[in-house]
């Protein structure tokens, strides 16, 4: 039987999808290791007798005699020799439907699942029959693994525009719905109208009508249903000659659609659920809440009894995209709970746009990604001399001076998941166009200028010397470190340590007070270190980033303290949570915590000894946002005056800036700390009025200052 298998070459379970339990090649798709059936003998593979260049998918011929038969009733009325002649053909089609098909494609034996075969061979659409495309083969294989894996509730596919996922999902619904008994298969989309007209009436019903008679179960209702496709015995009037019903022959299975509400199928037991355009469900519907409710329709106790197809391009974050993004985050097959499931139960999958772009498939259905040496004939009969990647890059280059249009194009045809999850520029607090310019630049940098690691006391001796230790699992990300002579530099004034490099840089901290063992809300401690304008170090640059939540708050405090000591930078700390300030004071480092800068004090306010800065002041909130806004305009992305690229290398912070909402700041820890660092860098020292003491006499006074 197909299912989970142990394989010595793989650390995790391999999902074997062969109905006959043979073991063939293993593909890794979307982080899932999937084992295909073992390839059969050469002569059992379609198109084996053709030259490699002529080996490609083609629909198999259907006997003309069978095409004239419309129902099983007509079949039963045919002569026995007729049925004997064509029964092997019908049995072979059922075998292909169950076990899948092997065919030669340009000299390579290729396996397609039974559901994929049903799409290609038997599912006619308004544009005719589907072409074989390699990326869709992988989608079908991935879904077969989701169906086979007892830990999975289904597939989540983040896609580019026009990738054919609706056709694929409709084909799966019809294929499964015409085989199983007493089941319900459901459809929802971003609106009820979309579910009814664009999927059910334009896809599902025509595909079913195109099936040959031997795949069509008994159907109740009209030939063009609008609400449901019901495979049950039609109602009959009871007469003297008809006192019984043959309902046992019917499947009693239904494919239907429902309006877009969070609980549309609540209380139902679903066999397959297709959630179309799940990244575009807008309020009052919420795809997170809908999935929380409706996945229970696919589970009975601990058993998963149904599967889901969830696919979409992604709307702007405030129009359903953020909720979809959260489901995506929790659907990583490499992040499972103790029961072996992802948090959502789904397995996510992404295909870059350049592997799924219309017009860029050769006649064998393989994507033309890179530029070919010679023009290549496409599956449409045209010739192309560039690859899909170059084509899309050319389109991007043409829009580089229109940030809004460029951003929308990238969102619709993404190369990466991050691009697919991009937010719309409209209504954003900051210039997202420039932020994305920086993100794209950072992705192309090699080697990566950011090093991950931890700061620690040398040899474990506190308050002596801090060193940095690279560690892939570290909590700090560092893009620049001071030269040896500037590290751990401090000044003793009035018997207290003061940071020795405050003329070079500063830091900002968004803290928390409660240990994670008592506070599970997920807010992280965040810190940024920033170089001001100076000749001693790269200016106007964030040099270190921290975003973590150790189990104990004091671990976070010590992490920040050590970094501050190492760089010799003072910190501006949000003082609504005062625990970190007390910690610095208890360790003798209170002078490493800045007081509220003079230019951010409320006019007429009384001076206070409290260190840090409140985050609930509207003046501070506005100044904080303006500081980040100005920094992005001047130092992020391409500088419009010089043409130079910014040196902001921390992608987590860039992504945090993208989503930042000034009226809902709570969850944007990195935005808070980075803005505080920029406010600290703005600190202005007021010049004191000089007095004339020529006629005054004073005792001589000595000051003691020791520099280390």
Residue ranges: model-predicted function:
Residues 285-303:
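Short, conserved "post-DEAD/DEAH" coupling segment immediately C-terminal to helicase motif II
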Residues 172, 198-207, 269, 289-294, ...:
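Alpha-helical scaffold elements adjacent to nucleotide-binding pockets in ATP/GTP-utilizing enzyme cores
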Residues 593-638:
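Short alpha-helix plus adjacent loop in nuclease-associated cores
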Residues 150-173:
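Walker A/P-loop
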Residues 2-12, 16-23, 27-31, 232-254, ...:
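RNase H-like, metal-dependent nuclease domains and their acidic two-metal-ion catalytic environment used
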Residues 176-183:
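Post-Walker A helix-loop "phosphate-sensing" segment adjacent to the P-loop in P-loop NTPases
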Residues 1-153, 202-207, 211-212, 224, ...:
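N-terminal accessory segments
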Residues 184-261, 309, 440, 444-452:
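Conserved nucleotide-state-sensing and coupling region of NTP-binding domains
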């Amino acid at each position: 039987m197909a299912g989970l298998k142990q394989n010595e070459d793989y650390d995790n379970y391999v999902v074997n999808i062969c109905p006959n339990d043979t073991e063939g090649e293993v593909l890794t798709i979307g982080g899932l290791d999937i084992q295909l059936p073992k390839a059969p003998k050469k002569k059992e593979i379609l198109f084996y007798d053709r030259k490699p260049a002529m080996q490609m998918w083609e629909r198999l011929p259907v006997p003309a005699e069978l095409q004239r038969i419309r129902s099983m009733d007509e079949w039963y009325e045919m002569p026995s020799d007729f049925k004997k002649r064509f029964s092997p053909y019908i049995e072979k089609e059922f075998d292909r439907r169950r076990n899948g098909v092997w065919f030669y494609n340009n000299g390579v034996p290729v396996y397609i699942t039974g559901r994929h075969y049903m799409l290609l061979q038997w599912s006619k659409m308004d544009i005719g029959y589907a072409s074989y495309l390699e990326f869709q083969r992988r989608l079908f294989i991935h879904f077969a693994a989701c169906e086979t894996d007892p830990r999975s509730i289904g597939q989540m596919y983040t896609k580019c525009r026009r990738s054919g996922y609706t056709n694929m999902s409709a084909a799966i619904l019809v294929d499964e719905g015409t085989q199983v008994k007493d089941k319900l298969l459901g459809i929802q989309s971003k609106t009820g109208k979309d579910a009814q007209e664009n999927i059910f009436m334009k896809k599902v019903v025509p595909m079913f009508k195109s099936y040959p008679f031997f795949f069509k179960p008994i159907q109740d209702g009209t030939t063009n249903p609008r609400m449901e496709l019901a495979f049950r015995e039609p109602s009959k009037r009871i007469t003297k000659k008809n006192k019984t019903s043959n309902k046992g022959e019917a499947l009693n299975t239904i494919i239907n659609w429902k309006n877009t509400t969070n609980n549309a199928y609540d209380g139902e037991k679903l066999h397959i659920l297709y959630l179309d355009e799940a990244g575009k469900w807008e309020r009052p519907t919420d795809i997170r809440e809908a999935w929380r409710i409706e996945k229970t329709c696919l589970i009975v106790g601990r058993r998963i009894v149904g599967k889901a197809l969830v696919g979409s391009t992604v709307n702007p974050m405030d129009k359903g995209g953020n909720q979809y993004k959260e489901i995506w985050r929790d659907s990583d097959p490499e992040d499972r709970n103790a029961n072996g499931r992802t948090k959502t139960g789904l397995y996510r999958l992404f295909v870059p746009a350049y592997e799924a772009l219309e017009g860029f498939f050769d006649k064998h259905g393989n994507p033309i990604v890179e530029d070919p040496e010679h023009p290549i004939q496409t599956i449409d009969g045209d010739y192309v001399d560039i690859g899909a990647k170059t084509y899309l890059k050319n389109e991007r280059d043409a829009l580089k001076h229109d940030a809004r249009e460029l951003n929308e194009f990238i969102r619709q045809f993404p190369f990466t998941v991050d691009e697919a999850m991009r937010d719309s520029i409209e209504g954003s607090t900051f210039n997202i166009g420039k932020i994305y310019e920086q993100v794209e630049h950072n992705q192309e940098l090699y080697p990566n200028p950011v090093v991950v690691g931890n700061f620690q006391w040398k040899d474990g001796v506190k308050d002596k010397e801090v060193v940095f230790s690279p560690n892939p699992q570290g909590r700090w990300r560092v893009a620049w470190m001071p030269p040896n002579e500037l590290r751990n530099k401090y000044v003793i004034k009035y018997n207290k340590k003061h940071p020795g490099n405050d003329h070079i840089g500063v830091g900002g901290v968004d803290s928390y007070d409660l240990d994670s063992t008592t506070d599970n809300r997920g807010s992280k401690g965040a810190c940024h270190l920033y170089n001001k304008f100076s000749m001693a170090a790269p200016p106007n640059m964030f040099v270190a980033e921290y975003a973590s939540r150790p189990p104990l708050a004091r671990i976070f405090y010590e992490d920040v303290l050590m970094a501050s000591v190492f760089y010799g930078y003072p910190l501006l700390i949000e003082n609504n949570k005062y625990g970190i300030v007390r910690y610095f004071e208890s360790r003798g480092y209170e002078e490493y915590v800045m007081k509220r800068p003079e230019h951010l004090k409320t006019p007429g306010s009384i001076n206070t000894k409290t260190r840090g800065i409140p985050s609930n002041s509207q003046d501070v909130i506005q100044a904080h946002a303006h500081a980040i806004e100005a920094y992005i305009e001047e130092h992020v992305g391409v500088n419009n005056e010089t043409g130079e690229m910014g040196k902001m290398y921390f992608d987590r912070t860039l992504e945090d800036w993208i989503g930042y909402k000034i009226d809902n700041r709570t969850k944007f820890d990195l935005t808070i700390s980075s803005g505080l660092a920029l406010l600290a860098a703005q600190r202005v020292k007021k010049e004191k009025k000089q007095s004339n003491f020529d006629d005054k006499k004073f005792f001589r006074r000595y000051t003691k200052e020791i520099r280390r």
